């Protein structure tokens, strides 16, 4: 009779758990009225306008026009979500339904939305989960100067100024005579956002294939976008400079924050959350000790390092105020530092509740240069 070897040699194979899939932050959703997609299906993903035509869209549909601009971006976006809006449905209700149906898209582009719709969507985007941005196009000339619209007694500011006054960080507005021009901007952003080394970007001064530049005065551009010295109403325009350069200005959200900063901070937050969750689910337990907390700090360090490699985080001097032992004027050689409060200082209530001591992630962004002043000194 042959006896089993496992009483002498017992081998257990432990297969490492899979990490959660990282959201790409590289897909926009176009929301329009065409009926090629039913409200029951609600959202479909496309890789080309040809696929949209095969699915029942026509070249006359606004979704097709916007998608053509999106896929024409020089950065080569690979995917676009298209959402359905019911005939009697509000843009807000449709956007919420699209988000419930599909959580992977990042930027919402409503087609032919009125100012009232944009205001509702902008408010929703500020708190939507997962993180969401709103990008819209307006051809309303009242956005080009400090004017109000409407009847006397019911006058309102133009949409750029109204969203700026609300300090909305998740709304990107573009003035353009080209229908759905903002789709071209988001096509560039979603295609460029690969997460690879040195892939960080800014939207300022980018060329937008398919979008016609608007004939605006310097005063109008300054009112909308501002410049290195003055603030505008934080809109965006596409203009020609010096008969040679067709450029987008300035790449800002309604509160003045640059688009790329909002995008990368959303991505960093997502990476940290998933990295820590992967750690918690892959270990028998994380002890409430300094080594245990250090294991959490280690995965956060790894997450931050990805954004050093992409070019969003870079070495620099910290001027963000005192955080534990970090003081203003300290050089962050890595571009970031992760600090935690001592386990010994933890309250008994937090320890009993199995809460980790507070952890602080301090980063220095690489920033970007949009304006240059040059002095030419000549000696005869």
Region annotations inferred by a language model:
Residues 1-380:
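Surface-exposed assembly/interface segments
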